[in-house]
Regions:
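Extracytoplasmic gate region of multi-pass secondary transporters
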Residues: 42-43, 248-296, 334-335, 362-397, ...
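Glycine-rich segments within core transmembrane alpha-helices of 12-TM secondary carriers
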Residues: 138, 160-185, 208, 334, ...
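Hydrophobic core of transmembrane alpha-helices in multi-pass small-molecule transporters
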Residues: 114, 120-140, 348-359, 458-474
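Cytoplasmic membrane-interface "Motif A"-like loop-to-helix N-cap segments
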Residues: 90-102, 313-324
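Low-complexity, proline/glycine-enriched hydrophobic segments characteristic of transmembrane helices
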Residues: 336-463
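C-terminal ends and interior cores of transmembrane alpha-helices
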Residues: 55, 102-121, 326-345, 444-452
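Extracellular/periplasmic helix-loop-helix junction of adjacent transmembrane segments
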Residues: 46-77
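Central cavity-lining transmembrane alpha-helices of secondary-active solute carriers
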Residues: 67-86, 105-107, 172, 294-307
Length: 558
């Protein structure tokens, strides 16, 4: 932990980090890293989990369904924030985040032994989603406790620096999950890893749980909470004080819309959406994609502490808003460049032989079927389903009513067919033939099934991914201190946890699912970026004009 001392001198030269403070930062951060590792394993393995737990639907639909299960954990995070936030404000910070880490570790380990769809049928995805819900509840109580605990140990003028170490934990947890997955995949080989080896990273959670519990048992309660408890000033009804009184509720709402919503979409775009874009859209080898993301996280992670420490000097608000604005302005050119350098064959094919679906819009359905029940049998739907499965970008061209949909690839036109009234056997024959014709035409036009490793410009892809991570560090590094400083100590755990987890659980957690559904519906591989851009712009506007700067506030007030 010598790095803690060396990096702490920038904003408060008269205070060096003592042994107790180092222990607080290290123990809180390490336990939270393990918890994020548990939570993000699922997202890192979403494509493999889709095959094991969501069988019976096409590859794209199964992946979107797996993303929905991933998002289920995010959906309940605000409820975890309410349940454990209340406990944290009533019984203490330390004991509450001990409970959360046990729930997280056990539920993650169970995923490692859970039979798949082929063994226990529909019970498999149901149990999986239940475990994701438990993970979400646990994480909903973890972050607010860790951030509050560390901030309440920090000396004045050092809260941004101290809490920035907590801010590294989500990215380090993701990095750790990718590293473990990469090691297992390399050791076992792709076939064995995808068959059964993917379970090993989940089972590792038992060991991490034991380490985390031991470390946290060594900690003392927050000095702010102890003093408040001794003076009888702790809240007896933190939920009522937080959300039933307008003077505090309006701060909660603004912390969400003018802070955590934008922070969340920048965070998930820069890490998870970027990973899924490499895997699903650019068809880069999973091992390579994970390595590139892990490399960008390794390079970018120190900037959490840099921006957190910088916020102690120049303020939290300006850095966070700058990150939102930079992300919104540059996302489109960055992701276009990722295509150009990550899979140049797709980029060139798009330029030389653009794909167009010529169809009557009345025949075209919304290409999003997470439960696998929709029947895409019109000529338009059949064409779009095949293109979506291959992640082929296409434009929509309106055709006259009554015409059969066509797919134009450069100068070549392939006619689809109407399958609505065909018998099952005839439909399969026609669809197989149409799929084969379309596949041949796409191949001749230069659209690859997978990215060619020899053509990928790895340094440029890594640079672009690192820029995305830098945006993440700008919005995320200072935000824990900002949230802690917005609320009084007696209801801090509850009040800060809810906007954080609605922002990150809902606005951010659903981003991959919503964005890929937007892509599947439109055929534009960049269309999903509108979601984070709009949210980031909203946060920047509200944050700049309505949110206060808090770096000089006294956080001991109750």
């Amino acid at each position: 932990m010598a790095v803690l001392d060396s990096m702490s001198t920038g904003s408060a030269p008269h205070h060096s980090v003592n042994r107790e403070e180092r222990k607080v930062i290290f123990a809180s951060s390490l336990g939270t890293v393990f918890e994020w590792y548990d939570f993000y394993l699922y997202g890192s393995l979403a494509a493999i989990i889709a095959k094991h737990f969501f069988a019976g639907v096409n590859e794209t639909t199964a992946f979107i369904f797996a993303l929905l299960a991933f998002a289920a954990g995010f959906a309940v995070r605000p409820f975890g924030a309410i349940v454990f936030g209340r406990l944290g404000d009533m019984i203490g910070r330390k004991h509450t985040f001990l409970i959360t880490i046990v729930i997280m570790g056990v539920s993650t380990a169970i995923v490692g032994v859970l039979p798949g769809y082929a063994t226990i049928g529909v019970a498999a995805p149901i149990i999986l989603i239940t475990l994701r819900l438990l993970q979400g509840l646990a994480l909903g109580g973890e972050y607010g406790g860790a951030a509050t605990y560390v901030a309440e140990h920090a000396p004045k003028g050092k809260r941004g620096y101290f809490t920035s170490w907590i801010q590294t934990t989500a990215t380090l947890g993701l990095f750790m999950s990718l590293l473990v997955i990469l090691a297992c995949r390399t050791a076992l080989g792709t076939e064995a890893f995808e068959a059964w080896g993917w379970r090993i990273p989940f089972l590792l959670s038992i060991l991490l749980l034991a380490v985390s519990v031991y470390i946290r048992l060594q900690l003392n309660e927050s000095p702010v909470f102890k003093k408040m408890k001794e003076e009888g000033k702790s809240s007896k009804a933190p939920l009522t004080e937080s959300f039933a009184r307008w003077d505090n509720l309006k701060i909660v709402i603004m912390a969400l819309l003018g802070g955590t919503a934008g922070q969340a979409v920048v965070w998930y775009t820069g890490q998870f959406y970027a990973l899924f874009f490499l895997l699903q859209t650019l068809k880069i080898d999973p091992q390579t994609a994970n390595l590139l993301i892990a490399g960008s996280l390794l390079i970018g992670t120190p900037f959490f502490v840099i921006f957190g420490s910088l916020s102690d000097r120049i303020g939290r608000k300006g850095i966070i808003m700058a990150g939102c604005i930079l992300a919104a302005v540059t996302y489109f050119p960055i992701f276009h460049a990722l295509t150009q350098y990550g899979n140049p064959d797709v980029f060139v094919a798009q330029e030389k032989n653009p794909v167009k679906v010529i169809a009557n819009p009345d025949q075209c359905s919304f290409q999003f079927d997470p439960v696998g029940k929709a029947k895409f049998t019109s000529s338009c739907d059949l064409a779009k389903t095949i293109l979506a499965k291959r992640a082929i970008p296409y434009e929509n061209v309106v055709a006259e009513p009554g015409t059969v949909a066509q797919v134009r690839i450069g100068d070549k036109v392939i006619e689809s067919f109407e399958g609505t009234t065909l018998p099952a056997a005839d439909f399969k024959t026609r669809n197989d033939a149409f799929t084969a014709s379309l596949g041949t035409a796409l191949k001749e036009a230069g659209y690859p099934e997978k990215a060619d490793p020899a053509k990928t410009n790895y340094p440029m892809v890594l640079l672009l991914l690192t820029v995305l991570v830098i945006y993440v560090t700008m919005v995320y590094g200072p935000i824990a201190a900002w949230l802690v400083e917005l609320f009084p100590a007696r209801i801090r755990y509850t009040s800060m946890s809810l906007p954080y987890h609605i922002g990150n659980g809902w606005f951010g957690g659903f981003l991959p699912t919503v964005a890929f559904a937007m892509v599947a519906a439109t055929g534009d591989i960049y269309y999903g970026l509108w979601y984070p851009i709009v949210i980031a712009v909203m946060t920047a506007i509200l944050g700049i004009f309505f949110m206060p700067e808090t770096k000089d506030r006294d956080i001991n007030h109750t």
